Amino acid sequence: MPDLANTPARSERAMLLILAGIQFCHILDFMIMMPLGPFLISALGISTHEFALLVASYSFSAAVAGLLMAPVVDRFERKRFLLGIFLAFAVATLLCALAPGFVTLLIARGLAGIFGGMMGAMVHTIVADAIPFERRAKATGLVATAFSVSSIAGVPLSLLMADAMGWQAPFLLIALLSAGLIWFGYKALPEFHGHLNSRHQGRAIRQMIAVAIEPNHMKAMLLTALVIFGGFTVIPYITLYAIANVGIAADQIPLIYFLGGAATLLTARLIGALADRLGKVIMFRVVAIAACVPVLLVTNIGSVSLMAWLAITTLFFILVSGRMVPLLAIVGAAVKPQERGAFLSLNATVQSMAMGLASMLGGLFITEAPDGLISGYGWVGLVAASFNVLAALWVSRVAIRD
């Protein structure tokens, strides 16, 4: 395993930028599905229920991928494994663009979810392997800017392309970007062998179970689930609530993504730097508790001006996504290096399952009134805020082993 602590800063930054690009591709691939809903429903002649299956197939496939990946991931060199699954992801995304109907698109989305879920876990594994703990939160913040760039440029550009060339265009764009990044990754990413020298012998399934049931690992995975429930109970229904209750026009929705993404592009690295300076646990608690404010505002505000709504949603983006920066550093340090790949694969499974379950939990509270307004969203906000408080209390139980 290379010691990037002593390599030139330029090499380390190049590695982090490539990893951020890989994150951008699979995050955009996931994010774009919900705003593409009207295009897909019209073009494929599907129902809203079938569209929901298209969205859910990615998360649940990613969860399955984590289970499949965990027993074997630490037996492979990191760079080759990442680029291999990235290539498979690019092919699956290309199949999405070529899908002629609902069933084939559903299968392609499932495949994209499998490899996209693996990619996310492997990116964070490499960051945890390569960057010393005292600088890891800042590095994680740089990689996390992939979410911001997806929101600022990826989603608006994809919607413009879909409007001009059809719903297939965004998937073609992602496949082409992935192909370019695979080449850059092959040229610039270092190889990682350190975990291979200290891997445990024995059956893969037995090793995975041992990693999964280790008490500190379970505490870290529970922390991840609490954080996801603290945001994803709310996130899937923001657009619906904005249009029905706040009075935001449909063509103004991209502004939410653009401004929120632009803000997090700046704040993710700031939060990471503060976490390195003040402490990951302290910074996580501050951001998680602060996130309760925009969570409750977004779900209870009612009809307000566009400017007021954008201010609230931008704060929501900053703090809800900002929790992930110290969280990923804490979770990555909760495991020994030789078990990190397997653990983060399992943690990715927990994250994907939590996303699906959280969105379903939020849906249990939400109903559409006869006048078209959305009711029950305020209760969703209270539930999400409660999970954030629980996460802030629970984080100190996770032991740092790096």
Give residue spans per PLM region:
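Helix-loop-helix hairpin linking two adjacent transmembrane segments in secondary transporters
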Residues: 142-189
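Helix-to-loop junctions at the C-terminal end of transmembrane segments
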Residues: 66-77, 267-279, 366
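Conserved MFS/SLC helix-loop-helix module at the cytosolic interface between two early adjacent transmembrane helices
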Residues: 64-103
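Extracytoplasmic gate region of multi-pass secondary transporters
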Residues: 33-34, 217-258
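Juxtamembrane intracellular "pre-TM" segments in multi-pass secondary transporters
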Residues: 2-9, 190-222
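C-terminal transmembrane helical hairpin of 12-TM major facilitator-type secondary transporters
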Residues: 281-327
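A membrane-interface helix-boundary motif in multi-pass transporters
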Residues: 163-175, 364-386
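Cytoplasmic helix-loop-helix junction between adjacent transmembrane helices
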Residues: 108-149
